[in-house]
């Protein structure tokens, strides 16, 4: 049996797995829990961890996430259940977030762990015309997340390093040594500091924009309890392609919005 695709690759087989139309059983489940007929289905581009489709039922748009990758039960068991609990919890966070509609956590009806949630208007912005406004819009979200009252123990799991099938450098990296050093650091001690509610995967690809304003924050399956610097640091890494000045500006704006220091 061949190894599953590298966690940072999207080869042809993975792309087909994630983008293909959901099976009839999954769409029948949607119809049964919503009480209407599926009118349209479209794959949503983005992450590599699951198959995500925009589904229209009786004129209402909703998002169907199916954890179809075969390595998911090993890399992150219980992820669908955790996402469902996170979506319930973020209802109290004062930012637009998806609303949980239904779950098939064991995949009894749909074949794989499945979540149905509300759709949020907006689109991901990777080429902002106003860089400072773009950064400010993101940094203003973080204090609202981190200031949420902590849930009861066990509702949201503590921060941990991502687990996956392989930590080997992907074939496209030009600096495998730097990659391996980054993996070592990521698996080191958890940063110190006051623990708060975290998005855990906070970066531009999960922030939706509409008419120049933030319209939503999506992908809550990695939500955790840990130091605020985890969300800040994760986003900093994802901003490196814009240059270190942008990374530093993001950090400064977050410090201004939160009243905290990034160490």
Feature-to-residue mapping (PLM):
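An alpha-helical support segment within catalytic cores of ATP-dependent transferases
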Residues: 21-37, 108, 143-200, 210-212
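Conserved strand-to-helix beginnings and helix N-cap segments that scaffold or border functional pockets
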Residues: 77, 128, 229, 247-248
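Short, surface-exposed acidic
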Residues: 34-41, 259-263
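Regulatory N- and C-terminal appendages and interdomain linkers associated
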Residues: 1-36, 112
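Conserved protein kinase catalytic core
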Residues: 71, 89, 124, 207, ...
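ATP-binding pocket architecture of kinase catalytic cores
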Residues: 42-158, 174-177, 192
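Active-site acidic catalytic loop and adjacent metal/ATP-binding pocket
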Residues: 45, 49-56, 63-64, 100, ...
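Active-site activation/catalytic loop segments of kinase-like enzymes and analogous catalytic loops
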Residues: 230-261
